[in-house]
């Protein structure tokens, strides 16, 4: 979808390299946030955001010939992973007109459909604008405002962290010449195989175009790392979910050994694709979150997440608060028999898996301890997407599809099972959007007033 009339030539400096293009200037939209040291003492940070490399125009280093069109690689430019990486460049982005991404001070708005583009995924850059901003979440608090009033069933306006490399993988994989400036290095607990480039090489080998998405496919390789989903939500449902992995750093996997959404064996990889989720509706509290409910999704809200550590400094509890209309509101309590509390702990996760009859893959990958080591350096991700694999039913409807809705853990929200089908939501709600703003980070109880 990105054709350009300009031409240029480039000298290849490596046999294998993930190149940076120059046909479109890359200018990161600015976004401010606040670093707090004590309650009421916060300092503004001048950051910016960058769009993920998977959304970018990928073309020949010698001219504007597409390396990737629709969901297919050019066979001449990309006969294999290494040749493709040497032949192809990631180019700059026009954030607003192409991707529907706008910023204003401390506010970031992501529009759902802009022209032929659907959704977006962005990373917070550091103040130098050279690498990703990293956060040590242990014994810390992360707070933001969000407006989900324009996010219907089937959409997910997500704010989360993963253990990406701060430089986008450049130091580990010198063949990666694009780096964080061009949004490289993504990884998560699904070990996604739809990435066009991983570890400085293309993902051409074994690439299979998607049968239901004209823009995507999956390759032989995936990119794995621990993931902390602070916020996956629309105006009907929300979930808070840690996902541990066996390694605290980004790793590349191959084929079905990746596990996750993109593989035949969901639990065959080194990460937990399910995580231990706290969705108030799924936990039996159907009056807590939604339009006109305790947390009214018709209005902007403040979301506070605290990462509590034990005496050894390891993550032991994840707590959630909301602030709306001047009121501090604790997370909903579980109403599921045998599962107590309103925070994520080891005991909560064990009891929840048992009550819902779910495989405890979370514990198999060492639970909270399995994500704790990664939390000393995580990258902030903000995205808006629809779900070509499960129509977002796992977030806002009944899931799995063949389960009985009245069984514990099956109902996750009030959305109809067909409402999240991508063709439906893209056709009916292209003007949907989410706005994140007022991001704050600091020690426990430093980013909001408990007596608000």
From Swiss-Prot:
PANTHER family for the chain: 1,4-BETA-D-GLUCAN CELLOBIOHYDROLASE A-RELATED, 1,4-BETA-D-GLUCAN CELLOBIOHYDROLASE B
GO cellular component, one term: extracellular region
Subcellular localization(s) per the UniProt record: Secreted
Segment forming the signal sequence: 1-17
Induction: Expression is under the control of the xylanolytic transcriptional activator xlnR.
Class of the enzyme per the UniProt entry, highest EC level: hydrolase
An annotated Gene Ontology molecular function: cellulose 1,4-beta-cellobiosidase activity
UniProt entry keywords in alphabetical sequence: Carbohydrate metabolism, Cellulose degradation, Glycoprotein, Glycosidase, Hydrolase, Polysaccharide degradation, Secreted, Signal
Enzyme Commission code: 3.2.1.91
Keyword presence, ATP-binding: no
Listed SUPFAM superfamilies: Concanavalin A-like lectins/glucanases
Database matches in InterPro entries: ConA-like_dom_sf, Glyco_hydro_7, Glyco_hydro_7_sf
Originating organism: Aspergillus niger
Gene3D superfamilies from the UniProt entry: Glycoside hydrolase, family 7, domain (2.70.100.10)
Record's function text: The biological conversion of cellulose to glucose generally requires three types of hydrolytic enzymes: (1) Endoglucanases which cut internal beta-1,4-glucosidic bonds; (2) Exocellobiohydrolases that cut the disaccharide cellobiose from the non-reducing end of the cellulose polymer chain; (3) Beta-1,4-glucosidases which hydrolyze the cellobiose and other short cello-oligosaccharides to glucose.
Glycosylation (residues): 62, 285, 335, 402, 445
A biological-process GO annotation: cellulose catabolic process
Protein name in UniProt: 1,4-beta-D-glucan cellobiohydrolase A
Family: Belongs to the glycosyl hydrolase 7 (cellulase C) family.
Main location: secreted
Family matches, as Pfam families: Glyco_hydro_7
Catalysis: reaction(s): Hydrolysis of (1->4)-beta-D-glucosidic linkages in cellulose and cellotetraose, releasing cellobiose from the non-reducing ends of the chains
Active-site positions on this chain: 227, 232
């Amino acid at each position: 979808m990105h054709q350009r009339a300009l031409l240029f030539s480039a000298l290849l400096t490596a046999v294998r390299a993930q190149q940076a293009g120059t046909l479109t200037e890359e200018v990161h939209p600015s976004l401010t946030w606040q670093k707090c040291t004590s309650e009421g003492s916060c300092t503004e940070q001048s950051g910016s955001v960058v769009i993920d490399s998977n959304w970018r125009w990928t073309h020949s280093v010698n001219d504007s010939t597409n390396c990737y069109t629709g969901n297919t690689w050019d066979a001449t430019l990309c006969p294999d992973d290494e040749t493709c990486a040497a032949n192809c460049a990631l180019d700059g982005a026009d954030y607003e007109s192409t991707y529907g991404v706008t910023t204003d001070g401390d506010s970031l708005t992501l529009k759902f459909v802009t022209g032929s583009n659907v959704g977006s995924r962005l990373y917070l850059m550091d103040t130098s604008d050279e690498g990703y901003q990293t956060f040590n979440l242990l014994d810390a608090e992360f707070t933001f405002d969000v407006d989900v009033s324009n996010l219907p069933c089937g959409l997910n306006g997500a704010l989360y962290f993963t253990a990406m490399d701060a430089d986008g993988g450049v130091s580990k994989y010198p063949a990666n010449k694009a780096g964080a400036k061009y949004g490289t290095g993504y990884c998560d607990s699904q070990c996604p195989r739809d990435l066009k480039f991983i570890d400085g090489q293309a993902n051409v080998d074994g690439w299979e175009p998607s049968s239901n998405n004209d823009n995507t496919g999956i390759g032989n390789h995936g990119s794995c790392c621990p993931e902390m989903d602070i916020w996956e939500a629309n105006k009907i449902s929300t979930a808070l979910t840690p996902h541990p992995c066996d390694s605290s750093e980004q790793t590349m996997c191959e084929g079905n050994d990746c596990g996750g959404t993109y593989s035949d064996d969901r639990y065959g990889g080194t990460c937990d694709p399910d995580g231990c989720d706290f969705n108030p509706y799924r936990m039996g509290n159907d009056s807590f979150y939604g339009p006109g409910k305790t947390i009214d999704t018709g209005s902007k809200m403040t979301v506070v997440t605290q990462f509590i550590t034990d005496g050894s400094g390891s993550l032991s509890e994840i707590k959630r608060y909301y602030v709306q209309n001047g009121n501090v509101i604790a997370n909903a309590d579980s109403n599921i028999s045998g599962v107590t509390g309103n925070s994520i702990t080891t005991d909560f996760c064990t009891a929840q898996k048992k009550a819902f009859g779910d495989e405890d893959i979370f514990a198999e990958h060492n639970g909270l301890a399995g994500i704790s080591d990664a939390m000393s350096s995580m990258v902030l991700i903000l995205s808006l997407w629809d779900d070509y694999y499960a129509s977002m039913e796992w977030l806002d409807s009944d899931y799995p599809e063949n389960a009985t809705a009245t069984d514990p853990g099956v109902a996750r929200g009030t959305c109809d099972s067909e409402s999240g089908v991508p063709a439906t939501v893209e056709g009916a709600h292209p003007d949907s959007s989410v706005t994140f703003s007022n991001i704050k980070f600091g020690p426990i109880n430093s980013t909001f007033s408990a007596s608000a």
